[in-house]
Amino acid sequence: MKLSVSIFVLLAVSAFGGGSAAAVSGKSEAAEIEAGDRLDALRDQLQRYETPIIQTILARSALGGRAPSEQDEVRAALSRNAFEPSEVISEWLQTESGARFRSTRPLPPAVEFITPVVLSRDTVLDKPVVGKGIFPIGRRPQDPTNMDEFLDTSLLSLNQSSTVDLASAVSLDVSLLHLVSARVLLGYPIALAKFDWLHDNFCHILTNTTLSKSQKLANIIQQLTDHKQEVNVLSRVEQKSKSLSHLFRNDIPYPPHTQDRILRLFQAYLIPITTQIEAAAILDHANKCT
């Protein structure tokens, strides 16, 4: 859903408001409109990452195996082609809250961030459950602790084959790491837009002196979480995965569970890590609450 507010709201303020109060209200409304427009654009950009991520996973899976020494070559390729976020995000990653999302070089940011276990071992992941809905977000005890381990586990599930072209395989592996990192790092500018858009809501949490830092973070995450929107994203990802992995006559099938792994990447890692980045960035803005 688009968040932009009609410009007629501003016209109404100027027509019926009075004096400085109307001017202040008009400025506040204008700031919310601008923040809503930014948020719309950033959400569109977030959605644009879905198809490239899915296609890259499918392309890598379609090669049919893993090359000898592929993991070592991926690290070497990352060293030669380091991922560089924008200057603003790079600066934030050097702060206390942003440092949690840095990765061991040469890995790109956020791919080693450890998400908490929030689901039970036997959680139903992709079917409606009475009283619990569908598509629960988060990690189970048996899931790898971070995205890098998850992608490594997916790679190791492929049979080793000397016929797989190493350069092609490594190129796709590196591209996937860059894509998932870039996708979750969009959480930072999204957080700035959400803070401006819901300034009073977040400042009510940030200025509450009875809450600890961890409690504030938990409340911010609760404020940010929109499970309906998460379900929409995961439903779309599931549909895209099925459509893009359609097999034609005499095609060799994708490795088992390829579609499940795509959904799990978004469900257990991409969505919750993006939310964690948003929450950490908003927590940094307490000094902007007046």
From Swiss-Prot:
Gene Ontology terms: biological process: aromatic amino acid family biosynthetic process; chorismate metabolic process; effector-mediated suppression of host salicylic acid-mediated innate immune signaling
Annotated glycosylation sites: N159, N208
Key word Glycoprotein present: yes
Keyword annotations: Allosteric enzyme, Glycoprotein, Host cytoplasm, Isomerase, Secreted, Signal, Virulence
Localization per record: Secreted; Host cytoplasm, Host cytosol
A GO CC annotation given for this chain: host cell cytosol
Observed effect of gene inactivation: Decreases significantly the amount of tumors produced during host maize infection.
Induction details: Expression is specifically up-regulated during biotrophic development. CMU1 is one of the most highly expressed fungal genes during plant colonization.
Region (KWL1-binding extensive loop region (ELR)): 117-140
Subunit structure: Homodimer. Forms a heterodimer with the host cytosolic chorismate mutase CM2. Interacts with the host kiwellin KWL1 which acts as a defense protein that protects maize from infection.
Catalytic activity entry: chorismate = prephenate
Activation and inhibition: Contrary to classical chorismate mutases, CMU1 is not subject to allosteric regulation by tryptophan and tyrosine. Activity is decreased in a non-competitive and allosteric manner by the binding of the host defense kiwellin KWL1 which probably blocks substrate access to the active site of CMU1.
Domain characteristics, as noted in the entry: The extensive loop region (ELR) is specific for fungal secreted chorismate mutases and is required for the interaction with the host defense kiwellin KWL1.
InterPro entries xref list: Chorismate_II_sf (IPR036263), CM_AroQ_sf_eucaryotic (IPR037039)
Effect after changing R183A: Impairs catalytic activity
Annotated signal peptide: 1-21
Record-given protein name: Secreted chorismate mutase
Effect of K194A: Impairs catalytic activity
Record's function text: Secreted chorismate mutase that is one component of a cocktail of effectors shaping the host metabolome and acting as virulence factors. The enzyme is taken up by plant cells, can spread to neighboring cells where it affects the biosynthesis of the plant immune signal salicylic acid by channelling chorismate into the phenylpropanoid pathway. Interferes with the activity of host cytosolic chorismate mutase CM2 through heterodimerization.
EC number: 5.4.99.5
Molecular function via GO: chorismate mutase activity
